Regions:
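Non-heme Fe(II)/2-oxoglutarate
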Residues: 56-148
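Short coil turns that delineate tetratricopeptide repeat
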Residues: 1, 30-34
Length: 201
């Protein structure tokens, strides 16, 4: 049972038994190379063990990037668009606390996948990120590793949510089991972060 094997790998990690966790994760990946949870368990096991393969699997310098989204059709500037998007997203934040069984702590999250939203500014967001996604995929290229091997002919967005953090809010470590590329778009940030003078957040 795949779920039981994943749970066992996580249990070995919790006990600090990296070799046992790595063996299970590698077995799961041999059966399903797109198993995100197994890949995350393997990366964690290699990191705990000090295995040099961790640096190849999690090549932050090559795989992490910063991009500015495009101005979608219908808006005269990115600033104008982001102002409208911020207002539209704020209307969707109807909850008063973070959702249970999610990674958010100290804030709210939209309960609806933004792909289902009907506000023009929200639907335009997916147009605005197409260019950066294509640029990112081109930059990382293809290769035999677990990540680049999936950089094939196309992509599609599976889900998107808006998070609004309160002071001292944060995310706990988590995995996106269905997503190959994960990203965050900062629509609005506090002045202390936006001015670039410190490393708050």
């Amino acid at each position: 049972d795949v779920a039981a094997r994943r749970a066992l790998a996580h249990a070995w990690l919790a006990l600090g038994e990296a070799p046992e966790a790595a063996a299970i994760a590698q077995d799961l990946l041999s059966r399903s190379p797109v198993d995100q949870e197994a890949a995350a368990a393997l990366a964690t096991a290699w990191r705990l063990a000090g295995d040099a393969r961790y640096r190849d699997l999690c090549d932050y310098a090559a795989l992490v990037g910063v991009h500015t989204i495009d101005t979608p059709r219908g808006w005269t500037s990115l600033t104008t668009y982001l102002d409208e998007l911020r207002g539209a997203l704020n209307e969707l934040h109807v909850l008063r606390a973070h959702p249970i069984e999610q990674s958010l702590r100290g804030g709210t999250q939209t309960s609806q996948n933004l792909l289902m939203a009907d506000h023009p500014a929200v639907t335009a967001f997916f147009q605005a990120v197409e260019g950066p996604i294509r640029a990112y995929r081109q930059a990382i290229g293809q290769g035999p590793d677990l990540f680049r091997a999936r950089n094939g002919a196309g992509h599609r967005v599976l889900g998107a949510w808006s998070v609004r953090l309160q002071p001292n809010g944060f995310h706990v470590d988590h995995i996106h089991p269905q997503g190959w590329i994960s990203s965050a778009c900062y629509v609005d940030v506090p002045a202390a972060i936006g001015d670039g003078e410190d490393h708050a957040g």
